[in-house]
Amino acid sequence: MKTNYPILRQILFAAMPLVLLAGCSDTDDPAPIGVAGVEMSKPTLELSLDGTERLTATVTPDNAADKTLTWSSSDEAVATVSSEGVITAVRAGHATITAAAGGKTGTCALTVNPDIYVAGSVYDGNNNAAVVWKNGKKLCSLTDGKQNAYANSVFVSDGVVYTAGNDGKPVAKVWKDGTELHALTDGTQYADASSVFVSGGAVYTAGYEYNKNGTPVAKVWKDGTVLHTLTDGKQYAFANSVFISDGAVYTAGYEGNKNGWYIAKVWKDGTELHALTDGKQSAHAYSVFVSGGAVYTAGYEYNENGKSVAKVWKDGTVLHTLADGTLDSDASSVYVADGDVYVCGVEEVSENVYMLQVWKNGKVLHSYTPADQKEESYLNSISVWDGDVYTAGYEGSADGYPAKVWKNDGELYTLTEDGYASSVFVYTGPER
């Protein structure tokens, strides 16, 4: 039988468009549009320790198929971030906040700044009142100003503020969050608390109390009770600084000898560890810091010409002589960070003209010129965090003694127009 191929081909060609049309549908979805980028509302952000802020992130293009954002923090010990982009500071430091969508990310470089606490006093024209400042603003008054009183040292542990000083009676005291925690002495003899340090929940204080013979005796208290009586009361002695390291209690101060000169000393657990000077000239040790098992002390020693010379000792031996001894100088506080030794104090740069100094590893790092260089000015305390150097003290002027905090090479805060800034503490947040 003969097949009619031409007719069959015509039928097939006529049916092909119908087949092709049947394979296409108006309901097919177009390819989804991907995310091109994520842009943060702020590329950088600074927060205080108790700070919060909400960031927003914009996903492009606007018609991207999936614009769902996922938020994360590179270090939740520094800051956390919620699913809505709310950042909550936890501890001073640096973290990267990331918003991610569709395989793309936007970032914000976050810095959480520490809180700066200062202990000192405010003069009202009649008396000094003991005061604590936080970030440049008065946090609390420890005394009522009816008698001269001074806050000499501040230490912050897990957000609790401890302060040491005297109440003007004068009774050596420790305050906790502005309220009296311990009266270290009974007020029958003059006493002062010079330094406070908190470790393992215990509160250590260094200072002195006069005995019945009118001689100051260097002491260390723990939780309000005498822990160590450092000297026997035969010669004048003062404990100026306390530091706890690996459970050991280090104290710096000075004690007189029979010739009437003071010897700079360091005690460990109540026993003399180092006599820093030989007693041929008077010397004072004001500050002790322990790092890597080494004991650093700052103070001064008089030379044979009767000039005080600022010095730093390490493990009982002179590490740095900070001035040449031609004119007076003094080192009041030492801090060790990342192996570098920072010291603050004052140096006479010409006859009766003074410069506030910060030294690093024995060399001048920062110099501050007081408003009136012929008036008494002083840097009392130093602290270092993240490479930034904080110092506290006061400048002399004809109108008073403005208490100030400096950061690196510039003034950070003027705390009061007439008073003293005795101690600075950089609080970085809760213990890890």
Q: What label would you give each PLM region?
A:
Residues L20-G23:
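C-terminal motif of bacterial Sec signal peptides marking the signal peptidase cleavage site
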Residues S25-P114:
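Extracytoplasmic soluble-region selector
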